[in-house]
Amino acid sequence: MLMNLPEILKNQKARARKFKPVKMSKRTELWYRQQLKQFVKMMTNDVERALQQPQGSFFMDDAKGFQAISAKALMKVLEKYEKSDRTSQAENIANGFVSRGDAQNHAEVSTNLKNQTGIDLSAYLRNSPNITEKVNALTAGNIQLIKSIRSQYLDKVQNAVMQAMVRGSLNKDLAAQIKDLGKTTEKRAMFIARDQSSKLNAALTQARHEEVGIKKYMWSASLDERVRESHAEKDGQIFEYANPPADTDHPGHDFNCRCVQIPVLDNNEQIVKNSPIVSQQEKQQMRSEWSDDFPDTIIDRKLGDATSHPLYENAKKGSIEDAYQLAKDLVTDDAVNKLKQLVGNKNAILIPVHAEEAVGQNMIPVAIATVLSKKLHIPVDLSIVQATKVSRTGGDGWHRLVYSPAFDGIVPKDKYAIILDDTQTQGGTLASLKGYIIKEKLLHLML
């Protein structure tokens, strides 16, 4: 049951209460950054060692070494490493991060409330089952994020090797690409540490406020040059936890948001008891409006043409060779010609849906993009990835509406994007991918 702090304070003498903002712990963020950086370094070193020829120099430093390993053997090494379990490592890092952030948040919120109300709520807020539930949810979310760092890196390495096989790229180019993937992965890990530190602080502050009956807060922005305009204009405004701003959500929830909330006590509001804790991982619909001049989807074949193909099941489960052969069999000249007319002389890239299915990693969209890349002379960009596993294959319409995929990643600006998937049932996946790209203002969309 919630403690009704505003109700208790009615009996106290009225006075101005100046609560301080509870800011995220820089020490906690730094610890998380260091742990994730070490996690990425160990992973990239492991993969690069796996690509070492049996005898001789490292292929990453000497491209000739790569010739000693067949493409099939190389893919088996990567797949074996991908199947190795690193869950305990992710759990240890996530537990350490959340426990540090929780301890700092508990101390600041409790001290802040005591200084302004004279009531010591430290023990109450430490032992609350609702706070424990929130901490567990945040820990689970960060475990999945840490595991995604590894899985996405391995996926991109596998895709790089596959495309090098198809295009006949030079070994030194592939080696350089794999090194660059390691650098990009480290940058993503640093972003996760920074972003999750803000989200952790915001979520725990909200949970502790709601636990004592505080329903409102004042938005507090740092107001430096990095603050987004939509956030700066909210500085000093009052919001309800039950009614977050539609464009930004609560402070700290948006990507890289450093804004915080300051509690507001309203003695006239009704105190709600036993209100449920809002999950930190709320579903966000990544959708945008459709303009009248948006190009129609080019549907190359009927769904049955793919699902009835003898290589379909293996390709859907993650077989790169079967996916590429399937793509070569299914992509038609008619579709290629339509795309050529649509692209014209525009500076375009191909962005396939890169998703993890219930049965494995679906390689078909990437394989289709690779085939189209060769025919259209347009590069494939794998920077955007599906950030949630929805497993909608075979699901009905309602299941697809409820489980909408979310995307993450950054792609170059000032380009036109051709987005593609292996199938289109209701169009929800492509709509979500389009919405993410439009939201991030990254690209002009073509398909």
Swiss-Prot record:
Query: What highest taxon heads this organism's lineage?
Result: Bacteria
Q: Check the record and name the InterPro entries matching this protein.
A: Phage_head_morphogenesis_dom, PRibTrfase_dom
What the entry lists under NCBIfam families is as follows: phageSPP1_gp7 (TIGR01641)
The text of the family note is: To E.coli plasmid IncP-alpha RP4 protein TraN.
Q: What is this protein called?
A: Uncharacterized protein HI_1407
Q: Which organism is it from?
A: Haemophilus influenzae (strain ATCC 51907 / DSM 11121 / KW20 / Rd)
